[in-house]
C-alpha cells in the first residue's frame, strides 16, 4: 500500500516474478492484484493495490482509490507493507501516519533510495523505524536491491505480528478530546 508512483507494482513484480504493467502516472493499477512468493519454505501471498494518498474518502475519490481503501479498512490484510517514495518522504508519510493510527502490523519500505541520494536526501531507516515504531527497510525496487532484507523482515513480522507503538503525538487539546 502506498501513494501512486512509489514503486508498489515494481516491488510486487520483483517479489512475485510477475510482469504487471508499470507506469509513471496514477491509475495504472486499478484493481487489487494477488501474487505469491516463497521465502524459507513459507508461501506468502501479497496484494498489489492502487495507489492512494489518504484513507479519508472524498467526493473526488476514484474507483481504484476506493478499492485500496476498502481493502485496508475491511481488515483483510494480516500485515501491511507500506511503500513510500524516499525522495518524497513528507508527502508519503501522511498515509503512513493514518495506517499507524489503525494499529495494524506494518512494515514501512523506503523505496527509491537511489533517487533520494541523487537529490542529496539522506534517510536513516533505523532512526525512522524508532520514530514510527515499526520496521523500516530501504530498497531500490527497480534494481531489486534490498528485496532479500525485505523478505526477511516480512517473514519475521509474520512469525510475530506486532502492532506498532503509536508514536503520533497530538496537541494537548486534541489528546484531551481523544481520551
Regions found by a protein language model. Name each.
Residues 114-169:
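Canonical P-loop GTPase G-domain recognition
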Residues 169-179:
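Extracytoplasmic
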Amino acid at each position: 500500500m502506498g501513494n501512486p508512483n512509489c514503486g508498489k507494482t515494481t516491488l510486487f513484480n520483483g517479489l512475485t516474478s510477475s510482469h504487471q504493467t508499470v507506469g509513471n502516472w496514477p491509475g495504472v493499477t486499478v484493481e487489487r492484484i494477488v501474487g505469491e512468493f516463497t521465502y524459507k519454505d513459507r508461501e506468502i501471498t501479497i496484494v498489489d493495490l492502487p495507489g492512494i494518498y489518504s484513507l479519508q474518502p472524498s467526493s473526488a475519490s476514484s474507483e481504484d482509490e476506493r478499492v485500496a481503501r476498502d481493502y485496508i479498512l475491511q481488515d483483510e490484510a494480516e500485515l501491511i507493507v507500506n511503500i513510500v517514495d524516499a525522495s518524497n518522504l513528507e508527502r508519503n508519510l501522511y498515509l503512513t501516519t493514518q495506517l499507524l493510527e489503525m494499529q495494524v502490523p506494518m512494515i514501512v519500505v523506503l523505496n527509491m533510495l537511489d533517487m533520494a541520494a541523487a537529490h542529496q536526501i539522506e534517510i536513516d531507516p533505523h532512526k525512522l523505524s524508532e520514530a514510527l515504531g515499526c520496521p523500516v527497510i530501504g530498497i531500490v525496487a527497480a534494481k531489486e536491491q534490498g528485496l532479500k532484507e525485505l523478505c526477511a523482515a516480512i517473514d519475521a513480522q509474520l512469525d510475530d505480528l506486532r502492532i506498532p507503538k503509536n508514536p503520533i503525538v497530538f496537541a494537548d487539546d486534541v489528546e484531551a478530546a481523544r481520551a
